[in-house]
A protein has these predicted regions:
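Well-ordered alpha-helical segments within folded domains of soluble proteins
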Residues: 42-44, 186-191
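Short, intrinsically disordered, charge-balanced linker/junction segments flanking boundaries
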Residues: 173-175, 189-193
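Active-site-proximal loop and beta-strand segments within enzyme catalytic domains
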Residues: 20-182
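Gly/Ser/Thr-rich helix-start
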Residues: 17, 89, 187
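Short hydrophobic alpha-helix segments
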Residues: 13-15
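Short hydrophobic alpha-helical segments used for membrane anchoring or interfacial signaling
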Residues: 1-6
Length: 193
């Protein structure tokens, strides 16, 4: 937990473990992906308002609300199954792979150990591959109508890449087992409601 005010950290303490096995304690240098949290906290309140206004029924299908899904395998997924992670959606799609030039197939993007190749320190135990090259056609260092999506300081993504993300989700396979498997892909789609 980190609390900061006016740029000054007033509290910073780690609690718990990385897994339920309690074998590795968390540290202040651990890196977390909070994108999933952001998708949920920005989407669920909107869905709740729509539900309270009787404009949204969790028993209806994704295709009912999103016509783009009508011809896909996502058409008949119920909102309830998507919200409870029982729709069979993939747990994760690495969208960033399409944003980078091809790496040597023996190299990964990240490593837990520093080396000549993994020399870009992200956290205490996380290093990025220095050979990563972003595709010029997808990024700009200047904001514009064509590049409005802020990714990082002085780095903007093409507006139409969001369509690529949506199409990748639409075309993704479903698991045949309808059991709990965390996936935030439905939250990407809920933003279109």
């Amino acid at each position: 937990i980190l609390i900061a005010r006016h740029g000054k950290v007033i509290y910073n303490k780690s609690f718990g473990y990385h897994t339920y096995r309690n074998s590795q304690k968390t540290t202040n240098d651990d890196l977390y992906d909070i994108a999933s949290l952001t998708k949920i906290t920005s989407t669920v309140p909107s869905l709740m308002v729509l539900y309270d206004q009787n404009k949204f029924d969790i028993g209806k299908t994704m295709g009912y609300y999103l016509p783009a899904l009508k011809t896909s395998n996502k058409d008949s997924l119920t909102i309830l199954d998507v919200l409870t992670h029982q729709a069979g959606l993939l747990p994760w799609i690495p969208f960033y792979y399409k944003l980078i030039e091809t790496l040597d197939t023996s190299e990964t993007l990240f490593s837990t150990k520093y080396s000549d190749i993994y020399s870009l320190k992200l956290t205490k135990n996380s290093f990025a591959n220095r050979n990563i090259v972003l595709k010029d056609s997808l990024f700009s260092s200047v904001y514009s109508k064509e590049f409005p999506v802020l990714v990082a300081r002085d780095l903007y993504l093409r507006a139409d890449y969001l369509d690529t993300i949506n199409q990748t989700i639409i075309n993704s396979p479903l698991s045949e087992k309808k059991e709990y498997k965390y996936s935030d892909l439905g939250y990407y789609m809920f933003h279109q409601l």
